[in-house]
Amino acid sequence: MPIYIDRRLNPKDKSLGNRQRFLKRAREELKRTIKEQVRAGKITDVDAEHRVPMPARGTSEPTFRPDRSSGERGYILPGNKEFAPGDRLPKPGASGGEGGTGAGRGGSDDDFQFVLSREEVLDLFFEDLELPDMVKLNLKEAVAYRPRRAGFATSGSPTNINVGRTMRNSYGRRIALHRPKRQEVERLEAEIARLEVESDKLGGKQLEALRAELESLERKRRRIPYVDPIDIRFNRFEQQPLPNASAVMFCLMDVSSSMGEREKDLAKRFFVLLHLFLKRRYERIDIVFIRHTHEAREVDEETFFYSTQSGGTVVSTALEEMQRIIAERYPSREWNIYAAQASDGDNIAGDSERCASMLRDELMQLCQYYAYVEIIDERETEIFGATDNGTSLWRAYRTVGDQWPNFQMTRIARPADIYPVFRKLFARQSASPTRR
């Protein structure tokens, strides 16, 4: 086991160990404050700035200092009108408020407040969460790449020359250096030819001047080439790595008539938190939204959260739709498949056992992780205190959880339960569950 020895020198009057412990305490205080604010407000408040108070006494790093309540210290104080030589002065207290008068007596420090940005809030909120078992057994060892346009370069293969950009640079350079145009040379040549025909004495002097000017123009044209090597530009390409381990999250929500506005609101809050978590922690992940009543269909994000459709309840239709989408677009040998389902547990007679059978025999063999959240009434928390009690869907899903350790289920009764339940389902694990 490797042993690390920190030989960094401490700064003056500081201790790196103390500073690290201080930063850890401050970070924990920020996380605790944000979680309390979100728990007391709306789940969507996570995706916003937060004004976080922190006690002023906790904003300074620990240092060694003399104890004012004990020991002897020598003072040299300025003169005043209140004390005479020989008077005994009381020692000031630890807060610095003792011995004062008026408004200064008994004072305390105000809380220090600052604003955390949206990115900082999300980083703290989802710091220790992750998708479980984010590994495929048959990941490709060689990383695949694809070329992507990345501007221009001054060197490269002749086949990648960008003619348009090269000629643009050439034209700009010729204008800046005042390269003589071909029309100017042709005009002088025509004038010289005309004077050579006349060949009089006056025309001879003018002819010499024109020939000298023509030679100067030709010399300048040779010195300033039409296309210079510095003008040439090549198309530049970067090799963009293709992701080997791709992930997809299926969000299954019951929107049947048995789900009241309260139940739907709790389910939507849970999925909003899940959506923020996935988009913040993972750059490349597909999210499939499925709503179901007596029939299920894949919808977009807007419809998933804001549609008012309702109807009967057949939970197995959502599992069938999920199974169909996996077969068409997400082969399990290439994708990490996750699912989160929210329902009130109400289901048509006989369908709960069918749902459990589909999960046990088919879907759980494809999924890395499956989370089931049941929305119950606050009064039912005491009735269904034992995990064996509950709706027919809950009891059927219990058999799935007994067989598959990567199947988790829990209940939500009030908005304050959402965040603890979310952390329970997606807490970072030291070891991933093994499939049976």
Curated annotation (Swiss-Prot):
Disulfide-bonded cysteines: none
Gly residues biased stretches: 94-106
Chain segments carrying region Disordered: 53-110
Domain of life assignment: Bacteria
NCBIfam families documented for this protein: PRK05325.1-2 (NF003707), PRK05325.1-3 (NF003708)
PANTHER family in the cross-refs: UPF0229 PROTEIN YEAH (PTHR30510:SF2)
Family: Belongs to the UPF0229 family.
Protein name per the record: UPF0229 protein Meso_0256
Species in which this protein is naturally found: Chelativorans sp. (strain BNC1)
